[in-house]
Amino acid sequence: AILHTEPDWQAFAQECRERLEAFTGDTERQMDVLREQHHAQLFRLLAQDLDGVLSVERLADHLSALADVLISVTLEAVWQTLSGRHRDQPQFAVIAYGKLGGKELGYASDLDVIFLYDDEDPEAPAIYAKLAQRFITWMTSHTPAGILFDIDIALRPDGASGLLVSSLAAFEKYQHQSAWLWEHQALTRARFCAGDHNIGAHFEALRIQVLRQTRDPAQLRSEILGMRQRMHEAHPNRSEFFDLKHDAGGMIDIEFIVQFLVLRHAAEYPAMTGDIGNIALLKLAGDLELIDSQLSVAVSD
């Protein structure tokens, strides 16, 4: 019966905290506890999935909620291991992008995240960089219980050449003055997922502000099409089978269409900034008559 009950993520988070606390000071055991908890919940969701009681959307919601909880409790546990911490609670947040950001996580998805802080302490940049580094280690290390998640931090400001953590002020300046269009596209599927809720609220306000900028439609279309073409050329399909993700008419094409619709119309239709997933955004675009409503339903299906 437990296998087939709806997950209670709040109770699960509390259970994780209690089990982690029981092994305070034993980092390796704490890391295994997180992995064991993850595996148990994955098994439950897989059982429900195989029984056909979960829609694709509902399963993705649960997998994303599971990741959110594990990110949150891991962040809390890691903070307690830092000898240089200067406050009880870090003024630090994890922002989710990509599949986690859009609550479209699959069983084997990696996590696209960036790290933001809002702290005037002169030691803050160094402390939060150490927090982020240790958080990544806890998530990605191979232990006897496996790994928790693969982490991708390529979407941080300035990419591979950028700092691991960004102050909220620097991130805001970057988005307004330096970010490429593809970085604004990425914001269509970004959300706060763990840490300081005040930073989360500031991030969401900034995200909406950026997405609602007035843009030249022709230039926007040209840039997005050019970017999509470069991606297509980087993933040639040499097989005789259709590549559901990369081929023309595949998932990435649909994602780019949704991102274009958001960046093109959010200034006039604020509802288009909602982080509600590609399917819901397509249906919303149809309801708002931005695209043919029958087409939006067909593509969503």
What are these regions (language model features)?
Residues 1-301:
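A nucleotide- and high-energy phosphate-metabolite-utilizing enzyme signature
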